[in-house]
Regions:
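N-terminal Rossmann NAD(P)H-binding glycine-rich loop of SDR-like oxidoreductase domains
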Residues: 7-26
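SDR active-site strand-loop-helix element
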Residues: 10, 54-58, 96-102, 148-150
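Rossmann-fold NAD(P)-dependent oxidoreductase module
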Residues: 19, 23, 87, 106, ...
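Adenosine-cofactor binding site in Rossmann-like domains, unifying the SAM/SAH pocket
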Residues: 32-46
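NAD(P)H-binding glycine-rich loop region in Rossmannoid oxidoreductase-like domains
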Residues: 44-79, 83, 87-90, 105-107
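Conserved Rossmann-fold NAD(P)-dependent oxidoreductase catalytic core, especially the SDR/UDP-sugar
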Residues: 82-123, 138, 146
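Active-site helix of classical SDR
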Residues: 127
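NAD(P)-dependent short-chain dehydrogenase/reductase
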Residues: 144-147, 151-174
Length: 174
């Protein structure tokens, strides 16, 4: 019988974090799940050593990307991600899963394959790419690092462009 995995999710209360937590909680014999916030460095109060896996979904998204927010994007999406990953590694966590973004490929990448070049067209995408590169360098035999680069994420209650797309789509004749 497989041992129960102890999972820590950063980004408590976020759309993705909440949905991952709810899904994992459907399997109480397989996963013990906790989530933590990252606002005001709340995550730094957590002892990571009691967890097997950290799923990092914390970050800035769904706000207008403007030059005056550049430093904030890099501080949260790059620097905090690197700090959380480093803390997980130093605490003996076995696996780190980072929710990156398809935006690391730019706006016109088409279908993503292993042949795509990373070419972010915004500092949102660049901040995610820079985090990806640093945390991947921490990957080794005792600490598995995985970056997931999803396109748009949607579902019941989601934010972002999907609700707007649905709204306009309902008005189109079919």
């Amino acid at each position: 019988m497989l041992a129960m995995k102890r999972v820590l999710i950063t980004g408590a209360g976020s759309y993705i974090g909440t949905n991952i937590e709810n899904w994992l909680n459907r399997f109480p014999s397989k996963y013990q799940v906790a989530s933590i916030g990252t606002i005001n460095n709340e995550w730094k109060k957590t002892d990571f050593s009691s967890f097997d896996v950290v799923i990092d979904v914390a970050g800035i998204a769904h706000i207008k990307i403007t030059e005056d927010l550049r430093d904030l994007f890099y501080s949260i999406n790059r620097d905090m991600t690197i700090d959380i990953c480093q803390t997980a590694r130093e605490s003996g966590v076995k696996q780190f899963i980072f929710l990156s973004s398809m935006n690391v490929y730019g706006d016109d990448c088409g279908i993503v394959t292993d042949k795509n070049n990373e070419n972010p067209s915004s500092f949102y995408g660049d901040s995610k790419l820079q985090a990806d590169k640093v945390i991947q360098s921490m990957n080794d035999d005792s600490f598995a690092v995985c970056s997931v680069r999803p396109p748009a994420i949607y579902g019941k209650g989601c934010k972002g462009n999907y609700p707007l797309l649905v709204k306009y789509g309902q008005k189109l004749p079919v």
